[in-house]
């Protein structure tokens, strides 16, 4: 299937009229810089394009809650900025986004609430500011989860 065909099918599966699904697919493809992919098969998409078409499929029926797994993984910086803007606009219009990410700077920038989970256990949860304790969320994550290794044994690097 091509990207446009896929999105129309997904929209119709969610109860959209075909013409509405086509219109929304066109808008989503343009917003996510996939319009030029045209009739290219999704199976031929790059990893970043695949991530973006999956996001478009999740958005096409305008759900109240959107659950995303690493939405910025494998996308270029311009696409990541576009996706952040789309998600920000979506939440301003009343939508809720639940996402997983290993990029704490993005989480701190985008999210109002956060939970840090390690090995299936919630270590801390609350507003982003509460969890970060007024500091950097990445540093807080590292302090809670651990795993920072010393450079011992790597003294040969850079020599």
Please place each PLM-identified region on the residue numbering.
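ABC ATPase "signature
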Residues: 125-126
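Conserved catalytic motifs of ABC-family nucleotide-binding domains
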Residues: 62
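Conserved ABC ATPase "signature" region
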Residues: 8, 12, 19-37
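Helical segment within the ABC ATPase nucleotide-binding domain
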Residues: 80-93
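A short, surface-exposed alpha-helical micro-motif characterized by mixed small hydrophobic
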Residues: 107-109
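Catalytic Walker B motif of ABC-type/P-loop ATPase nucleotide-binding domains
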Residues: 66-70
């Amino acid at each position: 299937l091509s990207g446009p065909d896929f999105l129309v099918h997904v929209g119709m599966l969610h109860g959209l009229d075909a013409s509405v699904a086509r219109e929304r697919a066109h808008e989503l493809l343009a917003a996510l810089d996939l319009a030029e992919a045209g009739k290219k098969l999704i199976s031929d998409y790059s990893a970043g394009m695949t991530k973006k078409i999956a996001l478009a499929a999740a958005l096409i029926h305008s759900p109240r809650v959107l659950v995303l797994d690493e939405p910025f993984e494998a996308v270029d910086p311009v696409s990541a900025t576009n996706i952040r803007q789309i998600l920000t606009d979506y939440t301003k219009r009343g939508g809720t986004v639940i996402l997983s990410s290993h990029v704490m700077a993005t989480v701190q920038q985008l999210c109002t609430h956060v939970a840090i989970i390690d090995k299936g256990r919630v270590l801390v949860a609350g507003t982003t500011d509460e969890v970060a304790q007024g500091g950097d969320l990445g540093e807080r994550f590292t302090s809670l989860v651990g795993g920072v290794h010393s450079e011992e044994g790597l003294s040969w690097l850079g020599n």
